[in-house]
Amino acid sequence: MDPARPLGLSILLLFLTEAALGDAAQEPTGNNAEICLLPLDYGPCRALLLRYYYDRYTQSCRQFLYGGCEGNANNFYTWEACDDACWRIEKVPKVCRLQVSVDDQCEGSTEKYFFNLSSMTCEKFFSGGCHRNRIENRFPDEATCMGFCAPKKIPSFCYSPKDEGLCSANVTRYYFNPRYRTCDAFTYTGCGGNDNNFVSREDCKRACAKALKKKKKMPKLRFASRIRKIRKKQF
């Protein structure tokens, strides 16, 4: 220790450093969207190798037969490897995952918005309205689009890893598991740890899981009646 530095100042600096590291640990890590949202690519060769890719439309890892050369990075040897890489992709309603179709041959194009799964935002495009009865990723304005498609948010501390603490007690507590979206029991030692620590499972659910289960109200659009048929399949 620097003899010229007061003891109190050293303790304060140590406390601030630990607090900053704790805050950083609460933030969710990257979701690998640049890999997981790449389209399925079999490659040009003719081998039949069992692989797994993240399917943006079902929001799950699925099997495919890889040709053996080229392709892209959305290509995993096992389901577990795919799930480990892509589970952080935020879940959105099915209609918000659909590709946008541009009606180049229609007249009277109007400004619409679609949800971009890669950027997780709503973006402007011009639609001719040729397929008004088709279920599409198409909304009349940005607010309607974001209101229905934007991923549900939970407090940042819900992403903090399970932390049993630093002491020697054996206290049953609960933490939110963001991967499986469940509140699980763990043994807390009585001191230290982080804010992802709840006295009861219900407290954990109220803080971290309740917002994820709340259903969003379907906007009143031309294709709303058909979209209702797929609501049961939403995550």
UniProtKB/Swiss-Prot annotation:
Finds in a complex with ABCB1, TFPI2 and PPP2R3C; leading to the dephosphorylation of ABCB1. PANTHER family: KUNITZ-TYPE PROTEASE INHIBITOR-RELATED (PTHR10083). One of its GO terms (biological process) is blood coagulation. It comes from Homo sapiens (Human). The keyword Calcium does not apply. Gene3D superfamilies: Pancreatic trypsin inhibitor Kunitz domain. SMART domains: KU (SM00131). Disulfide bonds join C36-C86, C45-C69, C61-C82, C96-C149, C106-C130, C122-C145, C158-C208, C167-C191, C183-C204. Glycans are attached at N116, N170. GO terms for molecular function: extracellular matrix structural constituent; serine-type endopeptidase inhibitor activity. This inhibitor contains three inhibitory domains. The record marks R46, A47, E107, G108, S168, A169 as: Reactive bond. This is Tissue factor pathway inhibitor 2. GO terms for cellular component: extracellular matrix; extracellular space. Keywords: Blood coagulation, Disulfide bond, Glycoprotein, Hemostasis, Protease inhibitor, Repeat, Secreted, Serine protease inhibitor, Signal. Umbilical vein endothelial cells, liver, placenta, heart, pancreas, and maternal serum at advanced pregnancy. May play a role in the regulation of plasmin-mediated matrix remodeling. Inhibits trypsin, plasmin, factor VIIa/tissue factor and weakly factor Xa. Has no effect on thrombin.
